[in-house]
Amino acid sequence: QPKDIKIGLVYSRTGPLEAYGKQTQAGVVLGLDYATGGTMRVNGRKIVLVEKDDQGKPDVGKSQLASAYADDKVDLAIGPVSSGVALAMLPVAEENKKILIVEPAVADSITGDKWNRYIFRTGRNSSQDAAANAAAFDKEGVSVATLAQDYAFGRDGVKAFKDALKKAKIVHEEYLPTNTTDFTAGAQRVFDAMKDKPGRKILFII
């Protein structure tokens, strides 16, 4: 009997990024189904998907990946949604000498200064997003405020965006927790920073 191919999927089944997590899970299942012609087998070996909920929390994601490698004996893992969770998971892949395919977290540091040889990614990173957005309004006399989530995704994204700007000026950076539902105070700080600036004003939300 050929040995099963076990793939760990660590994603936000619950938590603030649940919507992205559901998309990731659906994409992985559809992709495997398509790639195997609906058989979920490769060379006679059955593909088994082991799903783990990181809850959008770095410590939970780290322990869930460790469990997938050690207890479930997965051959490789996919995930997570959150960049903060991804950064916590990177050393686990290295310690276990097993592949982690990061999807869809985009922080530059995942495949930048925090990268190790077991880490791959299928999507773009923050710098690529930033370069495209900066090209759209990087002009003299433009004032820009940023509004981002206060963790690796938001902070890496703002840094990449600032690095891509050559002419426009960043006049304010606002970071809010991922579970924020009342933006009144943060928005007011943005408006106060922008109100007396001449020329075109842009709020860039990450």
Regions found by a protein language model. Give the residues of each.
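Beta-alpha junction/loop-to-helix N-cap segments that form part of ligand/metal-binding clefts
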Residues: 19-26, 34, 38-112, 122, ...
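Local beta-strand N-terminus motif with an aromatic residue
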Residues: 7, 74, 198-202
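Extracellular/periplasmic Venus flytrap/periplasmic-binding protein
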Residues: 63, 108-109, 117-206
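Acidic/histidine-rich, surface-exposed loop or edge segments in extracytoplasmic proteins
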Residues: 7-16
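Cofactor-binding loop segments of dinucleotide-utilizing enzymes, especially the Rossmann-like FAD-
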Residues: 12, 54, 149
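Short, low-complexity disordered leader/linker segments with a strong preference
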Residues: 1-6
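Redox-cofactor binding/interface segments in oxidoreductases and associated redox assembly factors
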Residues: 9, 79, 204-205
